[in-house]
Amino acid sequence: MDKVNKIKIVLLSIICIIVFFIWGAREEHHLGRGFTYFESPGHVAYWKKGDTLHFDIPPKVLSYKNTWNTLLVKQHPRQYPHIEDTPYFYPYGRDTIYYFFVDKRSRTVTGPLLYSEMVSFLQERDLSQMLHNLK
C-alpha cells in the first residue's frame, strides 16, 4: 500500500507541474492598468471590471512600446473572412501600417494614424522618444 501512495504522490506532482507550465505559457502580456496584449491573434485590449471588453485594437499588432501611463501600438490590420466588429476606419485601406496612441490614465485611443501623423502627434506632446526602438 505504501508503494501505491508513493506512485499517487508522484503522479499528482507531475500533473501539478504540467498544469503549472500550461498555465504559465499563456500568450498574454499584462501591460498595466487593465491593458493586455494577446499574442494570438495579436491584439491589445482593455478590460473593465470583470470580463467586459472596453476597447480593442484589433489584429495584427506588430509591436508596441509600453510605459506606465501610455502605450504606442504599431498595427497592420487584417481582413477576416468573417465580419470584423471594429470601430476603427482605416482611411488608407488594410494594407497600410497604422499607429495607435493609448493614454492609459484617461483610457483614450488616438488612431489609426500614419507614421508621419504619429510623429507630429507625439512631438506636440513632447513624447517623440516613444518612437525610438519601437518593440
Listing of model-derived features with the role each one plays in the protein:
Residues 9-70, 74-76, 88-89, 129-133:
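N-terminal export/targeting and maturation segments
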Residues 1-8:
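Positively charged n-region of N-terminal signal peptides that target proteins for export
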Residues 51-57, 79-84, 106-111:
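Short, surface-exposed beta-strand/loop "edge" segments at domain boundaries and coil↔beta transitions
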Residues 75, 101-102:
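Short beta-strand element of the conserved SAM-dependent methyltransferase core
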Residues 4, 29-30, 105:
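Intrinsically disordered, low-complexity regions of eukaryotic proteins
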Residues 79-100:
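Structural motif
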Residues 103-135:
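C-terminal partner/receptor-binding element of secreted or periplasmic proteins
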Residues 44, 69-71, 79, 99, ...:
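Hydrophobic residues embedded in beta-strands of well-ordered beta-sheets
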